[in-house]
Amino acid sequence: MKRREFLRYTTLGGLALSGSGLLVHALAGRHSQTLPAALLDNASIPAGQPLQPLPRIVNLSDQVGRFHSVLTPAAHAVPVSDGLEATLWLYNGKVAPLIEVREGDELDITLMNELDQDTTLHWHGVPVPQAQDGAPWDAVASGESRHYRYILHRGSAGLHWFHPHPHEGTARQVAHGLAGALLVRPRLDVLPVEVEEHLLVVSDLRLTTEGEVASHTAEDWMNGREGELLLVNGQRAPRLDVAPGTTLRLRLINACAGRYLRLRLEDHELTLIGTDGGLIERPQPLKELLITPGERADLLVRVSEKPERSFELASHPYTRGWMGAKPTHLDEIAPLLSIHTLNAGVSPAVKLPNPLSHIEPLGEPAVRRQVELAEVMPDHGDHGAVNDTPHAGHGGSDSHHGSHGRGHGGSHPSDEDRAVRPKVDFLINGRAFAMNDVLFEGQAGEVEEWDVFNNSHMDHPFHVHGTHFQVIATRDADSEWQDAPWLAWKDTVNLAPYQRLRLRMVFIEPGDWLFHCHIIEHEELGMMATIRIS
C-alpha cells in the first residue's frame, strides 16, 4: 500500500482557522535548506490570548471503562500569524491533544502512520506490557498501522504523555510537534472540588520565516534542541482570568526536547502536590521548581486576594552546561502564563487532606547496579567516560543502526542531518546504544537499587521505561550522601554535573526496557541502554 500524506489545517497560538478547507500536499522528498534559514522569533506569535484547554481525542467506544480511538500522525498546515502557516506533524491535526481515562479503564488505540518515515507511540510514564511500550524495535512503517491495547491498573493515576520513539527518528519528529497528554484520573479524587484545574503542555518550536521546521544544528545535537518559540498548549504566554483567592491546580508536562523549565510565579509560593507517578504524601512549599524534559509537575497555587492584578508564571535562566554558541534566550526570563485576578469576590481557601496519598518505601534491594552517564569527545578530550571502555562508535555512525532480530530499525537520519551531528558519543557505562545490546538482566518483582552517576559537565534527565522509581538519596559533587527530602514515584529525574542519585524500583512486566537521557538528541546520539527482565 502506497503512503499518502495529507497536509491539513489546525491552529497554533489560539488563531482562528484560516483557508478554504483541506489541502493535500505530497511532502515526500522535501528537504530543508542547505544554508541556515532566517528564523521566526517569539514575538512573531501573538501573546496574551485566553488560555485554551487541550484539544481532546474523542472516545469512539460506547462501552463503559473502555477508551478506543485512532491516532494519525501526519503533516498539517498550522496558522502561526497573519499570512504565515507552519508545517507541523501532529496527531489527528491537534496541537498537544489529550486522552482522558480513569484507573481500571482499557485503553485501545490504533496508530495509523501517515508520515513519510517510521514512527512509534510511546506511553511515557504508564506501566504497560512491554509489547505496548512503543519502543524503537517496534517501529510502525510509513503507511502502516499498529494496535496498542492495555489496562490502566490501580496506581496508574497521574498526568502522563505520549510521543514518538523510533530509532534515530525521535528528535526530528518531536521537533515537528508530535506529542500528546494522557490524563489518568483516580477512582477516588481526594482533592476538594473547589480547586480549579488546568493542564499545561509546555513545548517549543524552531520555525523559519517561511513556516518550515528548521533543521537541527550541531549545537542542537550537543546540547538538546531549544526552539525559539516557547508555547503552552500551543499558545504563546496565554492569559488565565480567575477570581481573587482562587486555588489553582496547574498540572504541567515538559514536552520539550532539551529545554529545562525553572518555574517561578511572581509574588506567589508554589506548592508541589504530585510528580510523574501521581500525588506525593504531603504538599511541599517551594519558591521555584525545576522541571526537566519529560518530567511532570502537579502544583497548587492560591492566587492573591487582590483584584485586578497580574502575575507571571515564567521559566528563569538555568545553567546546564551548554556547549558551543549560546543562544540569547538562555539568559532571558521566558513567560509561560499570565494569571489575572478579576474584579470579583474573594474565593475562600481550601483545605487539603493530610496525607494526600500513601507511598510505601521500597525495601532492601535484591540487586544493586552502577549506571554511569558520560560523554566522549574524540576531538576535544574526554568528558567523563573511561577511554579504554568499549563502545559502539561515534554519534551518528552506522554502529547505532542494527536491529538484529528486533524488527526494523526505525527512521534513519538524512545525509544533511548526519553531516551536522557532532563527533561525540553520549554513553551509558561506556557504551552507546545499539538495538541488539542488552546492558543488564533482571527478574520481575525484585527490588533493584541503581546508583546513577552523571560523570559529565552537563545536566542529564534520566528516564526509565516500564516502571516508576523512588529517589532514595542524592550526592552532589564533593559532598556526602543525603536522604531525599520526600518520597515520590518518578520516571524521570535530573542529574546535575557529577551528581549521583540512588534509585529503587521494581519491574513487574517482563521484556526489554529502555533507560536513557531524556534530552532527545543525547538519547539519539547513544545515551540509552536496555535492561532485560525475565
Predicted feature residues:
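Extended, hydrophobic interaction surfaces within ordered domains
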Residues: 6-8, 320-330
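Active-site pocket scaffolds in enzymes
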Residues: 123-125, 131-136, 140, 272-283, ...
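Short acidic, glycine-rich loop/turn motifs
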Residues: 254, 265, 315-319, 454, ...
